[in-house]
From Swiss-Prot:
Residues reported to bind substrate: 95, 124, 163, 185-187, 226-229, 265, 292
GO molecular function: 4 iron, 4 sulfur cluster binding; lyase activity; metal ion binding
Top-level division of the source organism's lineage: Bacteria
Family: Belongs to the ThiC family. 5-hydroxybenzimidazole synthase subfamily.
Cofactor binding comment, as recorded: Binds 1 [4Fe-4S] cluster per subunit. The cluster is coordinated with 3 cysteines and an exchangeable S-adenosyl-L-methionine.
Organism, scientific name: Moorella thermoacetica (strain ATCC 39073 / JCM 9320)
Record-listed [4Fe-4S] cluster binding positions: 407, 410, 414
Protein name: 5-hydroxybenzimidazole synthase BzaB
GO biological process: cobalamin biosynthetic process; thiamine biosynthetic process
One protein family per Pfam: ThiC_Rad_SAM
Amino acid sequence: MSQVLDARAGKITPEMEKVAADEKVDVEFVRAGVAEGTIVIPRNTNRKVLKPCGIGRGLRIKVNALIGTSSDRDDRQMEMRKIAAAEAAGCDSFMDLSTGGDIDEMRRLTLAHARVPVGSVPIYQAAIEAIEKRGSIVAMTPDDMFAAVEKQARDGIDFMAIHSALNFEILERLQASGRVTDIVSRGGAFLTGWMLHNQKENPLYEQFDRLLEILLKYDVTLSLGDAIRPGSTADSLDGAQLQGMIVAGELVRRAREAGVQVMVEGPGHVPLNHVETTMKLQKSLCGGAPYFILGTLATDVAPGYDHITAAIGGALAGTVGADFICYVTPAEHLGLPTEQDVKEGVIAARIAAHAADLARGNRQAWERDLQMARARVALDVEKQISLAIDQEKARSLLDGTGEDGVCAACGTNCAALVAARYFGMN
């Protein structure tokens, strides 16, 4: 049985109970959301997730971190340190995007070390192995693609980004209209090259039922990869992107009918005036499926600060519909991230998620902000630190900054102290 089929049968699973307790909502609310497809709980039947999370309507916005080796840097111990740094910073899930070294071993290490759900992009491994065995990505076979999905599912991957919502109709629209940045999704580029070279339809689209059978077998959550997400603000909301949303919506319905949990990925670089339209279109076209967004990067001109551009766009996107934010680090567009980059990316995404949760009326978010406000008025340093999104940084700045009962920033002229003294406010 899958989470979806259990939910439709009226059964409440241990994962649903954990999500409900964490979110402080009724477990029946979670069960109903899983049953109708507006909530997913990534969890492979071959893996015990110590900290499961629910993603979707009525729940807190979650944050995903990326790790993985590459041909330029195959340092598995560094990736383990990144996992520790990201979990300490409060991420809700990981995706292993490894393309270098022993990909199987890296995945198994990630699954063993991470306490949260772990995702992957199987087409990466299929493509790299095609290069190693046959000299070219376009030499992949459909069986190679599905074998990678099966192997990673068997190992315990909880959710997979799979670019099924890409077909020749979308590519023809893209070629006819043109783009500044064409295709920036790596998986999308691999498949596009394969399709155009071989003049064959995307197997992950054409044989979608075959894919669903594998995912259902292990209760892997399908994350419909956004193969043609905009790579620049100039390309946002073009015809190809909209056609991709329509196809994704059709596949969401088929996945739900098969009993497979499914969410949809987007959007990349999106100017702020396009964010609300993008979110509402996706929710409408995809039947309210959870929306998993990269960023959203609100401008193209801030290399070195793209964790900030992504937090700006991500906060707005979360406010109007996004459910799951994939972090962006300061190294985006510049190089491979360090452990510190990973931490800063998670913190920035968590700030965006929390700000959006406030705007959405999430009670836990509002209670946390209220407690922080009270702690500041009371000059309760320890309470302020415990409530901070980045507790380590808050402690480094607040510890030893002044006497007890004296504001660290304002001293004896603190507005809160003056107000309390003369107006009896506290």
